[in-house]
Regions:
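Catalytic cores of DNA base-excision repair glycosylases
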Residues: 2-175, 250
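Acidic, metal-coordinating catalytic segment for phosphate/diphosphate chemistry
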Residues: 167-196, 263, 299-317
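N-terminal strand-loop-strand
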Residues: 178-223, 252-255
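Acidic pyrophosphate-coordinating catalytic loop
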Residues: 187-191, 215, 260-271
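Short, well-ordered beta-strand micro-motif
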Residues: 199-201, 273-277
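NUDIX/MutT-family hydrolases
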Residues: 275-318
Length: 319
């Protein structure tokens, strides 16, 4: 949960998640939809899917006991170099590094690394150096101390160099370039897309929702169906096409309900939400994992992305 998310945000989610899934076996036995629902609001849902898959793999391949080595941990879904290194060193005292953003920043300043350190040769060099620094005695404490140094003193802005215990050997400080390090990759402009969504209400008051395919972005989450507009395509035409392709239905596009702007890691969207009339026919999961006709109070039982949660809130408020 702490990957990409601050501690203050994570704590209530963490406590609630453990109430739902108090043990690894409970998590492994749970339905993915229930895991995503418990994760709802944290974002980066691939983390939840990987956590669920890793729990299942630990149960089936390791007898329900977490592997005790870096190599075995690295084979679990969602366990990259950092996570595997942190668990192996802190929980099992294996002499391996745990290189997160804080550690990269400390080492880049300490060694005056003037190349971008997120990827490539410089990143591999820092990982190798970190591996050489980890002591055989209490490797987990060393890794945590290095991370804490980056979080508390060697901060991204205004590093507190006068208080730093390694200031005497810091090459970045000696050269007066510590504030310029680590070198960051040029920030790319995020593309923008217009996306449509249909609030389709049947005569009995039920709403049509669709579940995204597991391999899709936000896979496993539910949504008000729709999709991305093609160049020079009007919003109503886009919505009619998407609903036909996704569910095999014909709809009448009504008035605009709302427009929601939202940013993801690599792109931004304007979500245009329309009230739509159901013209008949039985939905089919043509380009989605599943579909449901759901009463308004029951929408709370499904896991939705943040944009769809805002639509649900509007419906609950009577819009």
């Amino acid at each position: 949960m702490l990957q990409q998310t601050q501690v203050t945000t994570v704590v209530p989610y963490y406590e609630r998640f453990l109430q739902h899934f108090p043990s690894l076996s409970d998590l492994a036995a749970a339905r993915l939809g229930d895991v995503l629902k418990a994760w709802e609001g944290l974002g980066y849902y691939a983390r939840a899917r990987n956590l669920h898959a890793a729990a299942q793999q630990v149960v089936t391949e390791h007898g329900g006991k977490l592997p005790a080595s870096y190599a075995a941990l690295r084979r679990l879904p969602g366990f990259g170099d950092y996570t595997a290194g942190a668990v192996a060193s802190i929980a099992f005292s294996e002499r391996v590094p745990a290189v997160d953003g804080n550690v990269k920043r400390v080492l880049a300043r300490l060694l005056a690394v003037t190349q971008e350190v997120t990827h490539g040769a410089a990143a591999r060099r820092l990982h190798a150096i970190a591996a050489g620094l980890v002591p055989a005695d209490r490797p987990g404490d060393f890794n945590q101390a290095l991370m804490e140094l980056g979080a508390a003193l060697c901060t991204p802005a205004s590093p507190r160099c006068l208080l730093c215990p390694v200031q005497a050997v810091c090459q970045g400080l000696a050269r007066g370039i510590q504030a310029e390090l680590p070198v960051k990759a040029p920030r790319r402009k995020r593309p923008h897309y217009d996306v449509t969504a249909a609030v389709i209400r049947r005569d009995d008051g039920r709403f049509l929702i669709a579940q995204r395919k597991p391999e899709a972005m936000l896979g496993g989450l539910w949504e008000f169906p729709g999709g991305k507009c093609q160049p020079d395509e009007s919003l109503p035409d886009c919505l009619r096409r998407e609903i036909c392709e996704e569910l095999g239905l014909e709809i009448e596009v009504g008035s605009t309900m709302t427009m929601i702007r939202h940013g993801y890691t690599h792109f931004q969207i304007s979500l245009h939400v329309f009230e739509c009339r159901y013209l008949g026919g039985e939905p089919r999961a043509l380009d989605c994992a599943d579909w449901r006709w759901v009463e308004l109070p029951d929408l709370e039982g499904f896991a939705f992305a943040v944009t769809d949660q805002r639509v649900i809130q509007m419906l609950q408020e009577g819009h």
